Amino acid sequence: MKDLVKFLKAQSKTSEDFDVIKIGLASPDMIRSWSFGEVKKPETINYRTFKPERDGLFCARIFGPVKDYECLCGKYKRLKHRGVICEKCGVEVTQTKVRRERMGHIELASPVAHIWFLKSLPSRIGLLLDMPLRDIERVLYFESYIVIEPGMTDLDKGQLLTEEQYIDAEDRWGDEFDAKMGAEAIQALLRDMDLPQECENLREELQETNSETKRKKITKRLKLLEAFIQSGNKPEWMVMTVLPVLPPDLRPLVPLDGGRFATSDLNDLYRRVINRNNRLKRLLDLIAPDIIVRNEKRMLQESVDALLDNGRRGRAITGSNRRPLKSLADMIKGKQGRFRQNLLGKRVDYSGRSVITVGPYLHLHQCGLPKKMALELFRPFIYAKLESRGFASTIKAAKKMVEREDAIVWDILADVIREHPILLNRAPTLHRLGIQAFEPLLIEGKAIQLHPLVCAAFNADFDGDQMAVHVPLTLEAQLEARALMMSTNNILSPANGEPIIVPSQDVVLGLYYMTRDKVNGKGEGMLLQDPREAEKAYRTGQVELHSRVKVRITEYVKNAVGEFEPQTNLVDTTIGRAILWMIAPKGMPFSLFNQTLGKKAISKLINESYRRLGMKPSVLFADQIMYTGFAYAARSGSSVGIDDMVIPAKKYEIISAAEDEVAEIQEQFQSGLVTAGERYNKVIDIWAAANERVAKAMMENLSTEEVINREGQPEKQASFNSIFMMADSGARGSAAQIRQLAGMRGLMARPDGSIIETPITANFREGLNVLQYFISTHGARKGLADTALKTANSGYLTRRLVDVAQDLVIIEDDCGTHEGIVMTPLIEGGDVKEALRDRVLGRVVAEDVLKPGTEEVLIARNTLLDEKLCDVIDSNSVDSIKVRSVVTCNTDFGVCAKCYGRDLARGHLINQGEAVGVIAAQSIGEPGTQLTMRTFHIGGAASAAAKESSIQVKNTGTLRLANVKFVTNNEGKLVLTSRNTELTIIDAFGRTKEHYKVPYGAILSKGDGQEVTAGETVANWDPHTMPVVSEVSGFVKFIDLIDGLTVTRQTDELTGLSSIVVQDVGERATAGKDLRPAIKLVDAKGNDILIPGTDVVAQYFLPGKAIVTLDDNAEVHIGEPLARIPQESVGTKDITGGLPRVADLFEARKPKEPAILAEISGIVSFGKETKGKRRLLITPAEGETYEEMIPKWRQLNVFEGEMVERGDLISDGAETPHDILRLRGVHAVTEYIVNEVQEVYRLQGVKINDKHIEVIVRQMLRKGIVTKAYDSEFLEGEQVEVARVKIVNRKREAEGKPLVEFERELLGITKASLATESFISAASFQETTRVLTEAAVAGKRDELRGLKENVIVGRLIPAGTGFAYHQNRQKKVVMSDEMPVKLSAADEEEIAAEFTVTAEDATASLAEMLNMADDAE
């Protein structure tokens, strides 16, 4: 018995006990040590007996028996001969499954280079030998000789020789030197390398060299050499002399019916290798001519290449059906490869799938499960119960009963299923709410019934969607399903913290209908004692549902102790609202119910309920809302008839007016007054406006009706038109869709996105004619094509996001940092896009928040801001708060809970072990399909209107100016002379209300700190030209303004005024090239004037195209324009929107024409120009002058002599995130990416919390470039994980050494995923071959920190409930390391006796367990 226990133990070797996976190069000896024998023959199985051939690819002697515990010849059978090796056939008697583990090997007659290390760029062999790949290939494939040992000759080691050169050299020096070809030569060179010496040489070279490219190349080689030294890999192992053979059950040969066999491609590839190898051996024995041997060696090299990576070099070897054979590399890479097909995406047992239908009577935690499915899924449980209760004596009998579907089986099934949660999943699972747990209710029929409120989370509808069912088997799994995944625990969305269990469609319509009020309804003005009486009155037909009445309402309000106290008031309300109040949970205010409830209001109800009362009452309330909504939607009898689409009478006159305008424009075009482009834009504008007017008339018509009230007076009220109610409540449809039903369809777009200028004037009620229908099909088809593309693109974005963020887990409570990011309300122009409270809700404060204007602490640091504290912030009008952020978190491999803040789906501080990276990726990726794929073309008409020329304030308050320089002109107005001036309006409490950017040269009517009133225009400027503003008063003196050389004179025909236009440098005659046209201001005596407060002469250089309207010696006053520079009217710009924009931001792509930012602070000047570029110089107060070449066509925002700050805009354009990071730091780049991504989502009405985007930004900022390495393990210019540098720096600080300096680097998400520390994760993402090659050469260790690596190696992930498990494991390891225990032999025996189990004991304890399980039920 002892043996059996031992044996069973040995069978289930636990693979849990490892912490690191290391990858490296296998030495020939290692390959031989894995092997169980050499494969000598290419045969597979005997065609007569179907037994494996001896020494062949399936040999039983090498790989193990074909049948369990039976040798090949049949001499030994059964368990008792276990471990015997049969003397006849040489097969060990053991289990068949060893054929999945035992490897063989092939001794190669000639060395062969491993194609991965040769061809995977950069070629490792090439890098080591410092030879180009082309040359190495010529040696390997027998085209050239390579000198291995030059001896006393004047050849160099590693020099290539052609046939002729080799023969010449042999004639000349005989056997003084040694040159070879093929893999032997490369192997010899690699073997001869002295790695430490080579490293020394390279280090010296690195010190001496100055060229950047050379440095890069040397650093690369140095890293590779050091990797070899550290990992203990030998370079010559990249050339193989022994080839391992995969176990045969992993490349099976399967008999098909009809006597044919299906085989794995690998067998073909191995056969080729063995054939060629054997032939080569024979040729070598026969001492065949060199050329034949050489050819055979080349073929061997090619066949091994094909086995390892078919198609990497030359043409892929194809099988009998012209299809390339699948090599070892193909097995692991790509979507169908081992990683993504079998390790990251496994199929699951105990699962089923079926169509879903509605279950309107279910509770939120229930789902309807068809009896048939349940019976099949819970089979093992039913068998166990049948046996333990004595209905069946054996499993077989139980099976029979289940198949016969005896009556008792159904009773037991009901018992088994009770409180056993099951998981429902709808593909595509875009976020974690795509899998939720429910308690099953057995139902007749074959469709799964789903609760309507969870449809939003699953994105399910009932038009034929299918869902999968999974059964959690173990007790732990059931517990987790119930505690974490139950639908009742997932009320809030993890993306934004708002309820995701919200009613839609019918329910919304029902509640809206129920809470509407009506003028002069039956029984208006009644007094009712409570909602019960209201319901009674309604049921007996005394009142209508919408009648306005007075009802006594009892609300429950929490007192100081936190207990509910009733408060009763008489309230003006309607019957419907009073009835709805009956389902309200205790503690909700009636005011929330006493309104017409649309979709938003209902969502707010559930949110308030959750925040005030917690989960349980909210879930019950949500269910009640649903039942009530369905009931009253049925009562309302809303239906859509054609007469509900009321066409406004004004429609036809609006359309005819528009047609007249269009005809007029057409006439203007034909007489040449407007260009074709202008005509097109104007026509489209006219029709767009007409469409708006029709829509407005239609909505006015639809949305209100006139009724007679109790006094007999006419009164307007909201209409009870069904279509209007559906749109108004948010149940279905929108104003835009109603416009197409009853207004006019309007303008349609062509598939390329341009607008067709003839609109569809008909609507769907009138019907479209053939032409109109044809035009409208354009748009519809494009919509469908877009959707398909969008889904794929969005899925790929999600995959990249998950991959980059998967290893980010909350691993500690507080990292103790004082850093954070400053949050302010998002204000664009005159409106608040997002209030401060919405941005900081659920964050932790990084520094004490003070009451504005005092030193009083409102909120202490490290406090989590909840709704109550946000109210405090609001009431004290705080307008900026420093909150902690994931980006500034100091935790090394992960983040801390304090920096993350609130768990949005639960409403409290996030727990340790939460996988915030994956949550963030899913939250950003899930709405991806709702984003557009389009690039928006803005027509000329639209972009012309977009240029503002003044600022009109919307709120009364105080005006504030930031980064401002100005001069005051004669009229007392301010003229700006600074570039990025920001103007804000602040209210009486000091809150920012409006925020504008004001351009250079704008004229302000109010100054800093002055009061402004709403509607006042505070600034205006000319949008088409940029002035050069005089900063002093004086007389104009022209410098280098020479007619014909640098300027031309133009006279305006209409006004007769003449102006001077400065020529571009390129257009000037040679004599004028070096002249620098400028205007200097002098006083009456002709002396220079200095700009006040500086020692700079008032002299203004004029760029090309500048227009001067003054004459020489004219008098100018301060603040007047000296010249104007026309701003080139920017044509139609494409704005990348939607998904592509989000992808660009996360991939950190550089825009086409990026903005140019100042690299340092200093004074701007221009140096010598080249053909197409100008030289911009920035001279700082001290230090080196910085210079940059800028293309001439870029419009610059700075003049000569102007002061700029580091990071200021020099030329407009889209900013590059890399520049922002380099010049303005981590905070600025975070803010930029977060705001830009949010902009796209906000446009689509999708809410995502900022912190999800910050999580991704943190992952993009994981790496840094070492700038000063000192004597650390890093190389300068090396890309390293920031966390690693921080760890090293902490150590160095303790030792008192100087700290390693580094610059943060921003990587796009794909790059960042591939640059992750874990090679397993990177390999399973993209470019598998390259990643594995790199990892093997460097002998990388994978610490298995992330989720992906752990899923792949089959362990619990270190997140969620697995987080604690891994922590405990590590604690145990540490403890066992600390306490070595030595036992005496007697002790050991005693312990062994205690642990020995007899068969009786085992049976007894098993029975006991089953009984316990029974009792538990």
UniProtKB/Swiss-Prot annotation:
Write the Enzyme Commission number(s) for this entry.
Answer: 2.7.7.6
Native organism: Pasteurella multocida (strain Pm70)
> What is the protein name for this chain?
DNA-directed RNA polymerase subunit beta'
Q: Which Gene3D superfamilies match?
A: 1.10.132.30, 1.10.150.390, 1.10.1790.20, 1.10.40.90, 2.40.40.20, 2.40.50.100, RNA polymerase II, clamp domain, RNA polymerase Rpb1, domain 3
**Name of encoding gene:** rpoC
This chain's function reads: DNA-dependent RNA polymerase catalyzes the transcription of DNA into RNA using the four ribonucleoside triphosphates as substrates.
Its keywords, alphabetically, are:
DNA-directed RNA polymerase, Magnesium, Metal-binding, Nucleotidyltransferase, Transcription, Transferase, Zinc
Q: Which spans are transmembrane here? A: none
Co-factor requirement: Mg(2+); Zn(2+)
